[in-house]
Structure formats: structure tokens, C-alpha cells
Amino acid sequence: MKTVIIEYAVIDPVTLINKIEKAFPGAMAIFTDIDEDYFELSVWCCNDLEMLEDVLAEYV
């Protein structure tokens, strides 16, 4: 599992979840509001954590 905090101004959480689930078949992602500016994104069942970290690095 990987959890990161991302700013809403950077990317919409639904868009990011769709991108992750398309790039990593079998992965599941969910987001939780922290406040009006940030959300927490958690990703499970991703087999390639290095590649996931590269994808998330664009938005963190």
C-alpha cells in the first residue's frame, strides 16, 4: 500500500485514480478529503511500487 498527500490544485483525485487504475491493472485507489486544499490518496494491490512512485512523483 502507498499513501500520499496531494493538493487539489495539482490534479483532480478522480482523474488520478483513473490514471492509476488504467496503468496498473488490479490496483485499487481511494481518496479522502483532508481539507479544502488537500486530499490523501491510498493505492493497494499495485505490483510495481517503483513505477507507482514515479507516477505519483508528478503530483506530490
How would you label these PLM feature ranges?
Residues 7, 37-38, 58:
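Intrinsically disordered, low-complexity N-terminal regions enriched in serine/proline/glycine
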Residues 19-23, 38-44:
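Generic alpha-helical hydrophobic packing signal
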Residues 1-28:
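N-terminal acidic leader/helix
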